[in-house]
């Protein structure tokens, strides 16, 4: 077997040997709790909405923080799954996948880059373009915009919508039978 990126043995990918997928319902729950708490706070304190840089109360801050941390746990888990696919060399380590989310500005590019690398695997497994990484990247970008301009909870829900699409594509790719070894995955562009 060749060690170059994109090589996969003819053996079947057995999902039970891979780490479990992230539990996205937890992220949805945190996001919805955050949105509800934010709307309740805004209705009880309407003057806070008029401030130029409103500072959230501690309970809202903690919900935002926990949601963001859980999002990073999910990103780490996706890349850990990809790292452990037999014969597949995933170019992004789990730590790097999480770390680049902290680089202001670069994280916007990163929200398009890492789904593209996962899409290469998914599309290679199907032998055709099935996963569109631009869709995931746009959902992540919309989530950032929602988070900063409207409501952090709704932004978090949008992040997990993108993750649901990504999970669905990965699950379908892992459910396929074995494929013969090909030289490179198809382009996602």
PLM feature spans:
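Extracellular/periplasmic helix-loop-helix junctions in multi-pass membrane proteins
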Residues: 146-159
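Membrane-interface extramembranous regions at the lipid-water interface
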Residues: 3-59, 66-145, 161-189
């Amino acid at each position: 077997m060749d060690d170059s990126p994109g090589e996969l043995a003819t053996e079947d990918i057995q999902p039970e040997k891979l780490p479990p997928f992230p539990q996205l319902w937890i992220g949805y729950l945190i996001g919805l709790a955050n949105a509800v708490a934010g709307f309740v706070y805004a209705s009880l304190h309407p003057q806070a909405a008029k401030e130029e840089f409103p500072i959230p109360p501690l309970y809202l801050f903690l919900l935002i923080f926990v949601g963001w941390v859980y999002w990073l746990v999910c990103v780490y888990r996706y890349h850990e799954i990809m790292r452990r696919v037999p014969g597949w060399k995933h170019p992004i380590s789990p730590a790097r996948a999480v770390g680049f989310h902290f680089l202001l500005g670069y994280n916007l590019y990163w929200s398009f880059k890492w789904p593209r690398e996962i899409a290469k695997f998914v599309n290679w497994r199907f032998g055709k373009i099935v996963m569109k990484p631009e869709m995931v990247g746009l959902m992540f970008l919309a989530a950032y915009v929602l988070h900063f301009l409207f409501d952090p909870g709704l932004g978090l829900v949008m992040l997990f919508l993108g993750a649901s699409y990504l999970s669905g594509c990965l699950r379908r790719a892992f459910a396929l039978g074995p494929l013969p070894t090909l030289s490179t995955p198809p382009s996602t562009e």
